[in-house]
């Protein structure tokens, strides 16, 4: 049975967008390292953000759905690329807002993520 995938992105566009997103997250983490103990590791299709050596935020590619998923100790989110931004299909929140809220919640520190840090 064929999956119903209404996302019009071509697979190469999807990978380009997610790779850019992962790079931007890494750059943002570098800028926040002075504020709190935060770093990240890239493993295949997964970016793991380590917070205060005790918590993690995990972001991974869901290629077959052309989505990115974000998992925290509090919740899980599925994002689709809509109108040039990643939007949660449940909460309708922008990816960057959810990422920032999740990191602040897990560290109790003011962490700022910017879509464009240049």
UniProtKB/Swiss-Prot annotation:
Gene3D superfamilies, per database record: Frataxin/CyaY
**Pfam family for this entry, one:** Frataxin_Cyay
Transmembrane is among the record's keywords: no
Q: Could you provide one GO biological process annotation from this protein's UniProt record?
A: iron-sulfur cluster assembly
User: Which keywords appear in this protein's UniProt record, sorted alphabetically?
Assistant: Iron, Metal-binding
* SS bond partners: none
A GO CC annotation recorded here is: cytosol
Asked if the Swiss-Prot or TrEMBL record annotates the protein with the keyword Iron, the reply is: yes
What GO annotations for molecular function exist for this entry? Answer: ferric iron binding; ferrous iron binding
Q: Which InterPro entries match?
A: CyaY (IPR047584), Frataxin/CyaY (IPR002908), Frataxin/CyaY_sf (IPR036524), Frataxin_CS (IPR020895)
Function in brief: Involved in iron-sulfur (Fe-S) cluster assembly. May act as a regulator of Fe-S biogenesis.
The similarity comment for this entry is: Belongs to the frataxin family.
UniProt-recorded name of the protein? Iron-sulfur cluster assembly protein CyaY
């Amino acid at each position: 049975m064929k999956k119903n995938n209404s996302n019009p992105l071509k697979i190469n566009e999807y990978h380009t967008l997610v790779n850019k997103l992962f790079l931007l997250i890494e750059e943002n983490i570098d800028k926040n390292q002075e504020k709190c103990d935060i770093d990240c590791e890239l493993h295949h299709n997964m970016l793991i953000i380590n917070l205060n050596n005790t918590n993690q935020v995990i972001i991974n590619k869901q290629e077959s759905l052309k989505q990115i998923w974000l998992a925290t100790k509090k919740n899980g989110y599925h994002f689709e690329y809509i109108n040039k931004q990643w939007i949660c299909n449940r909460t309708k929140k922008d990816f960057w807002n959810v990422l920032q809220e999740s990191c602040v919640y897990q560290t109790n520190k003011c962490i700022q993520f910017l879509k464009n840090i240049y």
